[in-house]
Amino acid sequence: MNTLKKYRKLYDLNLSYQRTSNAVATERTYNPTTGGYVTHPVNVNGNWRTDGTFSTNGQFGTNKAFDWSSHSSFSYDHNVDMANVVGSTTHELSTIGSLYLRERLSVNYSQRGWHLGAKVQGSYNRMTGRRSDFKEISAWDYSYGLTARL
């Protein structure tokens, strides 16, 4: 009886969370008498980050000539800092959220020392903030291609 499997699969999952307490920010206050700014360090809380990845890959087909892989990842940053709003003489807390998503896929065929493959990857970034003068950012990026080794 032949017990050799015709395919192989691997999985990998990673998750993490980091939090910063008492981060040092620079507070800047406008002095209308002198026309300058007074700066000094202050502690802020609320900075944290979470991220993760999930990867899987495998082989299939006769002599495991085909292989495929998928790699997904995300991260979210919650950043708190001090900010000056244009026209204001005081400062305020500024909170920015940054989301990053990414996916990468590939399929390959190998036989007798030569190799053909296809790959595609894409990412999405989004930054949001609650300040009235903050402009939200949403951006997509993608790439694709073929590979060969003869």
Sequence positions of predicted segments:
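Exposed, low-structure sequence patches enriched in small/polar residues
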Residues: 1-150
